Amino acid sequence: MYKIQLLSCIALTLALVANGAPTSSSTGNTMKEVKSLLLDLQLLLEKVKNPENLKHSRMHTFNFYVPKVNATELKHLKCLLEELKLLEEVLNLAPSKNLNPREIKDSMDNIKRIVLELQGSETRFTCEYDDVTVKAVEFLNKWITFCQSIYSTMT
């Protein structure tokens, strides 16, 4: 009788591990990655909002899409990833002391790496974007808020 319960428990444990159920160590790594993503986005926002860069009105005329629904799960990071290439191109339009192309590329590569790690093997999610677009500063602010929300739910 107990054998069946034990075997059921083992089977369930193996199924959870095989399907990537979060463990305490993976949650700790996820928290570190979310925190790192948050810091990278905040640093990028600081550079975009720099008064010297605000003079470059072209950079602030481009529109970015944000998810239609409130982004609340790590799978929503796919939406950030899809708009990141455009953001990189826009930031490269206005090179300055604060936004040199090499720093932008390094920053974007780091953000992409973190997002891909946080997404894991989830590829089936399709982003649905809001009809209303936002400027670069609001775009970054929305994703910073997303990271803060995810981080606070994990602590």
Swiss-Prot record:
It holds the Pfam family IL2. It is found in: Secreted. Residues 1-20 form the signal peptide. InterPro entries: 4_helix_cytokine-like_core, IL-2, IL-2_CS. It comes from Boselaphus tragocamelus (Nilgai). Cytokine produced by activated CD4-positive helper T-cells and to a lesser extend activated CD8-positive T-cells and natural killer (NK) cells that plays pivotal roles in the immune response and tolerance. Binds to a receptor complex composed of either the high-affinity trimeric IL-2R (IL2RA/CD25, IL2RB/CD122 and IL2RG/CD132) or the low-affinity dimeric IL-2R (IL2RB and IL2RG). Interaction with the receptor leads to oligomerization and conformation changes in the IL-2R subunits resulting in downstream signaling starting with phosphorylation of JAK1 and JAK3. Disulfide bonds join 79-127. GO terms for biological process: adaptive immune response; positive regulation of biosynthetic process. Belongs to the IL-2 family. Keywords: Adaptive immunity, Cytokine, Disulfide bond, Glycoprotein, Growth factor, Immunity, Secreted, Signal. SMART domains: IL2. GO terms for molecular function: cytokine activity; growth factor activity; interleukin-2 receptor binding. Glycans are attached at residue 23. Transmembrane segments: none annotated. GO terms for cellular component: extracellular space. This is Interleukin-2.
